[in-house]
UniProtKB/Swiss-Prot annotation:
Protein name in the entry: Probable 3-beta-hydroxysteroid-Delta(8),Delta(7)-isomerase
UniProt organism field: Dictyostelium discoideum
Pathway in which this enzyme or protein is active: Steroid biosynthesis; cholesterol biosynthesis
Enzyme Commission number, as recorded: 5.3.3.5
Transmembrane segments: 3-23, 30-50, 101-121, 135-155, 169-189
Cytoplasm among keywords: no
Protein topology in the membrane: Multi-pass membrane protein
Domain EXPERA: 25-188
Family: Belongs to the EBP family.
InterPro entries associated with the record: EBP (IPR007905), EXPERA (IPR033118)
Main localization, broad class: endoplasmic reticulum
Length: 219
């Protein structure tokens, strides 16, 4: 049996949507964490392990790649997910030359993926460690994205490695990767606001307790 190449990715995205709809609070945050976690582990993790199998960039368009007919068993084959990066290598050549920094961060994505799923549980249960873990995860995601963008500039390889086509550059390179900078910034701000609010409550409670303890007792 054959399916279109985009089907496994669409099913995973739909699964994240369905699960997030059953959550009582912060549905968008839960969706982002689930979707991000799956991408970190299934896509980027697969590339990290099998980067050596991606040796050249694809010559077809993204639409043609997604509409290719592939065997159904590819849906759970990490080698196939790694091979999808031959398409992305068309926009960022580093994925076709096993760039050490890219491969390293793809292995780090496995940690991020696990943290995403753990954070989903913390969000649902409103666990005390939620915002500490959220800041930790967002820091790693943001740092990885910054390194992704600046290293071609640092080594003067941007024109050689990154597509010069405006659409491919701004949609596939800047747009897609920029999500892992923009959303972590938003979630980090959310965490700082929540932590500050909790400190204010504790401080207010402490002051009230001290005031009551100092209040003279009436006979």
């Amino acid at each position: 049996m054959e399916i279109f190449a985009f089907v496994p990715l669409a099913v995973l995205t739909a699964l994240c949507v369905v699960i997030s709809l059953f959550v009582k609070r912060e549905k968008l945050v839960v969706f982002w964490l689930l979707w991000s976690g799956l991408i970190h582990i299934i896509l980027e993790g697969s590339y990290g392990f099998f980067a050596h199998e991606v040796t050249k960039a694809s010559t077809v368009s993204f639409t043609e790649k997604m509409l290719e007919l592939v065997p159904l068993e590819n849906a759970w084959n990490p080698h196939w997910y790694a091979q999808l990066y031959s398409q992305y290598a068309k926009y960022d050549l580093r994925y076709a030359i096993q760039d050490p920094m890219v491969v390293f961060f793809c292995f780090l994505e496995l940690v991020q993926g696990a943290a995403c799923f753990l954070l989903v549980i913390c969000v649902i249960k409103q666990a005390r460690i939620r915002h500490a873990l959220q800041i930790f995860l967002c820091s790693i995601q943001g740092l990885g994205t910054v390194f992704y963008f600046i290293t071609p500039y640092i080594y003067g390889l941007w024109e050689q490695q990154i597509s010069s086509d405006p659409f491919e550059l701004w949609v596939y390179v800047v747009g897609l990767n920029g999500l892992w900078l923009l959303v972590p910034i938003i979630l980090t701000i959310q965490s700082f606001i929540a932590i500050n609010k909790q400190f204010s409550i504790v401080e207010s409670t402490t002051k009230d307790a001290k005031f009551i303890s100092r209040k003279p007792k009436t006979a």
